[in-house]
Amino acid sequence: MSRGSGGGYDRHITIFSPEGRLFQVEYAFKAVKAAGITSIGVRGKDSVCVVTQKKVPDKLLDQTSVSHLFPITKYLGLLATGMTADARTLVQQARNEAAEFRFKYGYEMPVDVLSKWIADKSQVYTQHAYMRPLGVVAMILGIDEEKGPQLFKCDPAGHFFGHKATSAGSKEQEAINFLEKKMKNDPAFSYEETVQTAISALQSVLQEDFKASEIEVGVVKKEDPIFRVLTTEEIDEHLTAISERD
């Protein structure tokens, strides 16, 4: 709907259109896709892996300073797809909330509790005229003491769901189609299979072979539940295993 025919419904975040749509929230989803990056998350039997593209827009940038993966606590990781500046403010607030939770209750914030907090925050941003929705889809990963590996996704509208596998970004639908086939029989992936499924899904939908420096991989394992970002050497090992398997 264009500005002229929108009747002002797309200018105000708090006003529904006659069709029952909130245009500003829809535009936030478009902003996520406009970033031109695709991210994938896969949950295995005893681990969770998230993979995203690493695009460095300027040759003079220090590559190590460009990242979409953020540790929230020692045990919880967040992968942000979309507007990185929006993600940073969300990450900072999430870190504060998780630290407060740890101080107040004496144990680490569970994955689903953090995901609900982020989703609640995003939902509030869709209600007030003086705010705008965040142009970010966040995947949160961690190991729950009772439920095991957990992968959640939160979007700009304030939805949050647990996933066996999911995707976000410009090729989201193609990735989901690929993952649905891979996860059809509810496989119990080992750690290596989880990482390699996520990387090969990204390779498949983007139809290109990556160098290790062109992707970022974040993992958590049940045996050692600390959130970790894989080094280029570790990513290289998985890329070699994938190419040998294919």
UniProtKB/Swiss-Prot annotation:
GO terms for biological process: proteasome-mediated ubiquitin-dependent protein catabolic process. It is found in: Cytoplasm; Nucleus. PROSITE patterns: PROTEASOME_ALPHA_1 (PS00388), PROTEASOME_ALPHA_2 (PS51475). Pfam families: Proteasome, Proteasome_A_N. Gene3D superfamilies: Glutamine Phosphoribosylpyrophosphate, subunit 1, domain 1. CDD domains: proteasome_alpha_type_6. GO terms for cellular component: cytoplasm; nucleus; proteasome core complex, alpha-subunit complex. PANTHER family: PROTEASOME SUBUNIT ALPHA/BETA (PTHR11599). The 26S proteasome consists of a 20S proteasome core and two 19S regulatory subunits. The 20S proteasome core is composed of 28 subunits that are arranged in four stacked rings, resulting in a barrel-shaped structure. The two end rings are each formed by seven alpha subunits, and the two central rings are each formed by seven beta subunits. The catalytic chamber with the active sites is on the inside of the barrel. The proteasome is a multicatalytic proteinase complex which is characterized by its ability to cleave peptides with Arg, Phe, Tyr, Leu, and Glu adjacent to the leaving group at neutral or slightly basic pH. The proteasome has an ATP-dependent proteolytic activity. Belongs to the peptidase T1A family. NCBIfam families: PRK03996.1. This is Proteasome subunit alpha type-6. It comes from Nicotiana tabacum (Common tobacco). The gene is PAA1.
